[in-house]
Amino acid sequence: MARMQESADLLKCSFCGKSQKQVKKLIAGGAVYICDECIELCNEIIEEELGQAQGQEEEHGELPKPSEISAFLDKYVVGQDQAKRILSVAVYNHYKRLRAHEQIGGRRRRDEEDTELIKSNILLLGPTGSGKTYLAQTLAKLLDVPFAIADATSLTEAGYVGEDVENILLKLLQAADFDVERAQRGIIYIDEVDKISRKSENPSITRDVSGEGVQQALLKILEGTVAAIPPQGGRKHPNQDFIQLDTTNILFIVAGAFSGLEKIIGERRGKKGLGFGVEVASKKDEEKEDIFKDVRPEDLVKFGLIPEFIGRLPVVATVANLDQESLVKVLTEPRNSLVKQYKRLFEMDDTLLTFTDDALEAIADLALERKTGARGLRAILEEILVPIMYDIPDRDDVTEVVITGEVARGEAEPELITHTAEEKTA
């Protein structure tokens, strides 16, 4: 009887049920008791959860301000100040929206004052070789998010020969090493979107599988949908498991040269003259990018984009054509400029590479003649330097290679400065 009374009087932990004899310490709080072991376990759980939250915060890092984003772009991209400002603000607002969404645990608050922040994708207008792709790549580098590039001309509507729209998302998943959460915060750059304009302004009766059909297929992923992604590509492996990817928080940057759009804008602005062969623009030398700055949705519709597609791209930025001066800056000024890269390659062979000012201007002129912009600069440098890069590893006597304007234009051979020449000069 005494033993039963002792058992009844024995205090127990309200959480694990252990008696006060089985634990080191039992703390009372009203009619509830907690032992030292449960306290230690609670502390471990709290520390783990706080550590995960802190790790997530460190992973995302502090969101750079628009001015900081623009300053970072300045280190790698020459000119395009207006485009940099627009992109910086758009990217800042996009990831600020993501942070706000994460702070409420991915759920919309039921507060009447809460405002849902809608995603703003970006449309980039500008000529080939003006730095559109590089701007997007540099943004992804700064933000440390997965980045994928897709060519709109390779896409077709589902069921036809070509790439499905879902293949774009597969590229982003691959860039994120199939980390779905990371991919869902990434950036997708779709180039040559002007090439998927529909054939006429009016809706087509016949199927336009590589034009309007692709625009229709892109609508859902641009706005936000949960897409089923085949990890090995869809059409060749129909029985594979699918990965669910939510595109709601993916930033899409859609770009194109939109050749001919300036005429449509010019006509709307009342610059269409009367008579045969009249120039569309009032000034013959008016820059295309200046006209592009006045682009309106109705101009893009007339060009061949469907209204629903334009509506998913509320932010419009234009990039300028690069002149000779800008191309010379592209060659020399960015942190990882082409000239710096080739100089480093020559340094590895203990050789100094020097470009004269007229050489840089000649290289820029060649890019302008070929109408390749900054994109064609590397190919021109390769043409000039490959023969000498072939010989230099076998020439221990060469200390410096000088590239002049004549060399760049193919009128002369590079000047080689050797140990012997230096000794004679000394």
Swiss-Prot record:
> Is Metal-binding tagged as a keyword?
yes
Q: Which residues bind Zn(2+)?
A: C13, C16, C35, C38
What do we know about how this protein assembles, alone or with others? Component of the ClpX-ClpP complex. Forms a hexameric ring that, in the presence of ATP, binds to fourteen ClpP subunits assembled into a disk-like structure with a central cavity, resembling the structure of eukaryotic proteasomes.
Q: Can you name this protein?
A: ATP-dependent Clp protease ATP-binding subunit ClpX
- Domain of life assignment: Bacteria
Q: Which residues bind ATP?
A: P127, T128, G129, S130, G131, K132, T133, Y134
Q: Does the record carry Aminoacyl-tRNA synthetase as a key word?
A: no
Function summary: ATP-dependent specificity component of the Clp protease. It directs the protease to specific substrates. Can perform chaperone functions in the absence of ClpP.
* Ranges where the ClpX-type ZB domain occurs: 1-54
Biological process GO terms, please?
Answer: cell division; proteolysis involved in protein catabolic process
Family under the similarity heading: Belongs to the ClpX chaperone family.
Gene symbol here is clpX
- Show the InterPro entries listed in the entry: AAA+_ATPase, ATP-dep_Clp_protease_ClpX, ATPase_AAA_core, Clp_ATPase_C, Clp_protease_ATP-bd_su_ClpX, ClpX_bact, P-loop_NTPase, Znf_CppX_C4
GO cellular component annotations, sorted alphabetically? HslUV protease complex
Gene Ontology molecular function terms on file: ATP binding; ATP hydrolysis activity; ATP-dependent protein folding chaperone; protein dimerization activity; unfolded protein binding; zinc ion binding
| Keywords on record | ATP-binding, Chaperone, Metal-binding, Nucleotide-binding, Zinc
